Structures are given as C-alpha cells and as structure tokens.
C-alpha cells in the first residue's frame, strides 16, 4: 500500500471483507453521535440512501480530522421497508419485533462508502440490495433469536445473512458485499484508480 488506509469503523464484518480482499488498513472508529445525526437527517426528509451516505461521510471526516495524511473510508448502512427506516435493535424484544415486521415482505439495504483525504471527500458511492423475507411465525423468530443470541443486536435488520440469518430469506437481489455493509467492488476499483492498491 502506498498510502495509509483507515477504516473509520469497528465493524467486524467490514474489517473481515477488507482483510479478505487483501487490503492493509487500520480501524479507528469515528467519535460521532450517529443516532442524533440519523434522527436529524430523517427529520429533514433525507432518503434512506442519503442517510447512509451522510453518516458514512460524517464518520470519514471525523477520523480524517485526526489523520489528515491518511485515506479514510467511512461506511454506513440503512435498512428500509417502504417508508419505515430501521435502526439496530436495542434488545432482543425489539429484534423480534423487527423480524416479525419484515415477515413476508421485501426490504431494502443501502450501503454507502466515502473516501476522505485531508478533510475532503474524494469519492463516494451508495449501492442497494432488496431482500425478501419468508413468512415467519412468532415461535420461529423466538427460537431463531435464542440460537443466534446477542449477535442479532449488531445488525440493523436483526439478522446476519452470512450466518444462520440466511434461513430467513426466500430471495435476494443485489450484491453480497452490499448486504454485508460495504460496496467492496466499487471501492477496490477506486483504490486501484488512485494507485492505493496494485492495479
């Protein structure tokens, strides 16, 4: 790597995706109040895609202010069912409510990535995927959440598609990496264009 790359996140799945892609990077979580910014954007009428992009930008800019020489990657993901925007569940009861509300319906995940260098946005993208959840009974959801435990609280949809959560779905349209929260292929293309990784 010719330039230091920092992921402005503590997300284990994003770190895994980047490591598996052969990227060398540091992970420094951004110190921002995501929920307050998210709520303000929603009050201002921002779309779920715009919310993801603005949160990713805020994270990257916050870390770039402390490490201006580095190329900082900020990421965020939003989930929406129609006009309802979801947030990470606070507890297992809320996780169950999330899953039951998705039952038999198609929801949308929006994953944003923003690169910032020296306090300036140099690249940004948002990609989306649509996921169809099979019809779920309350009893199944309860058993499922008992099996997966607290991991359900780490995802906006209360599921981890890369694990047992895959059993919740009947169909998926969109990029796998987008679903995991990182538009990896466009990111790798941009890093090659910028001569940050070997192209």
Curated annotation (Swiss-Prot):
GO cellular component: cytoplasm
Gene Ontology terms: biological process: nucleotide metabolic process
Cofactor(s), by name: a divalent metal cation
Catalytic reaction annotation: a ribonucleoside 5'-triphosphate + H2O = a ribonucleoside 5'-phosphate + diphosphate + H(+); a 2'-deoxyribonucleoside 5'-triphosphate + H2O = a 2'-deoxyribonucleoside 5'-phosphate + diphosphate + H(+)
Principal subcellular localization: cytoplasm
Source species, domain of life: Bacteria
Active site: 76
CDD domains reported in the protein's UniProt record: Maf
Cellular localisation: Cytoplasm
A Pfam family assignment: Maf
UniProt KW Nucleus keyword: no
Record-linked InterPro entries: ITPase-like_fam, Maf-like
Gene Ontology MF term list: nucleoside triphosphate diphosphatase activity
Keywords from the UniProt entry: Cytoplasm, Hydrolase, Nucleotide metabolism
EC number: 3.6.1.9
Family note: Belongs to the Maf family.
Function, in words: Nucleoside triphosphate pyrophosphatase. May have a dual role in cell division arrest and in preventing the incorporation of modified nucleotides into cellular nucleic acids.
HAMAP family with a match to the protein in the record: Maf
Name by which UniProt lists this protein: Nucleoside triphosphate pyrophosphatase
Organism: Agrobacterium fabrum (strain C58 / ATCC 33970)
């Amino acid at each position: 790597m010719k330039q230091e790359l920092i992921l402005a996140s503590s997300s284990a799945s994003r770190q895994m995706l980047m490591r598996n892609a052969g990227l060398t990077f540091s992970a420094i979580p951004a110190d921002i109040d995501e929920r307050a910014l998210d709520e303000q954007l929603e009050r201002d009428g921002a779309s779920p895609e715009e919310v993801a992009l603005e949160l990713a930008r805020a994270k990257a800019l916050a870390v770039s202010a402390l490490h201006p020489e580095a190329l900082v990657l900020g990421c965020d993901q939003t989930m929406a069912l129609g006009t309802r925007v979801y947030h990470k569940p606070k507890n297992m009861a809320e996780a169950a409510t999330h899953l039951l509300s998705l039952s038999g319906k198609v929801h949308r995940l929006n994953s944003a990535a923003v690169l910032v260098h020296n306090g300036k946005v140099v690249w940004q993208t948002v990609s989306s995927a649509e996921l169809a959840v099979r019809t779920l009974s309350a009893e199944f959801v309860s058993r499922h959440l008992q099996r997966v435990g607290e991991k359900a609280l780490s995802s906006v949809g209360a599921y981890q598609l890369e694990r047992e959560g895959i059993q919740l779905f009947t169909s998926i349209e969109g990029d796998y990496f987008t679903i995991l929260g990182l538009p990896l292929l466009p990111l790798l293309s941009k890093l090659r264009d910028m001569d940050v990784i070997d192209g």
